[in-house]
Amino acid sequence: MYRFIYYVQRDLRRWGRAPLNMFATMVMPAAWLLFMGLVMPVAYDGNYLDFVTPGILVMTVLTSGLAAGSSMMFDKELGYLNKFLALPAPRESILIGKIVFVTIRGLLQATVIMFIALLIGASVQSVWYYVGTCVILALFSVVIACIGATASLSLHDYDTYAAFQSMVSMPLYFFSTSLVPFSSMPEWMKYIAECNPLTYANDAIRALGTGDSPWLALAVLGVLATVMLLICGWKFRRATLN
């Protein structure tokens, strides 16, 4: 199964050859961080930048994770997937490589966002906070990457997947605790937020910063990651055996 490393290297090289793409993927989360943290007036008891930064980190990983489906769809449409399947390597290594790649990319982007947040006034936290944040974001990335990959294997072309990505990403983000505390939500919205994986990623990171226990949110993310890996693996085997 170590063969997945070659697929990770391939995607990292392809990403590195497109510096404009690397820059563009950072602009939106950085703009959201500056706008929500410094410009938009919000009634919040405390440093709102400390509250909103985890939400921006989660949005960054959400965007990167869903790109696993885009990459899978491109490989499928351009015929690379069939060529990879002909290689003497476990077919699951293709899927694992995609998930690991988008997780690495999301963590690199999140690191830049954390640095920007510190520059504009977010509180400095302990080393364990940043290590724990990376672990939480990695788990969350696996969940989202599996959702994206499963969707791309179920859809027929890139345009359809792009529509799915647009339809899913913003509702997931806004119907979570990324920008608004759970206690400030209307009752109907709380029910949606409780079913949203972004809420658990946000809550776990914020718990690290406030000294509360993140274990419940981490457990939920761990279960979701395991379930989505099983579903995505099943879908990938079924799609590539036909």
Segments (PLM) and residue ranges:
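Aromatic- and glycine-rich beta-strand/loop motifs that create alpha-glucan
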Residues: M1-M28
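Membrane-interfacial helix-loop-helix junctions in multi-pass membrane proteins
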Residues: R14, A43-Y44, S123, Y173-V227, ...
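Pore- or pathway-lining transmembrane helices of multi-pass membrane proteins that form conduits
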Residues: F23-P29, H156-T177
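Short amphipathic alpha-helical coupling elements at transmembrane boundaries
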Residues: Y6, R10-R14, G79-A86, L153-H156, ...
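Short, hydrophobic transmembrane alpha-helix segments
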Residues: L38-G46
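Hydrophobic alpha-helical transmembrane segments of multi-pass membrane transport proteins
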Residues: A31-F35, L49-I120, F140, G148, ...
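Alpha-helical transmembrane segments and their short interhelical loops
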Residues: R91-Q165, D212-G233
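Short cytosolic juxtamembrane segments of multi-pass membrane proteins
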Residues: F236-N242
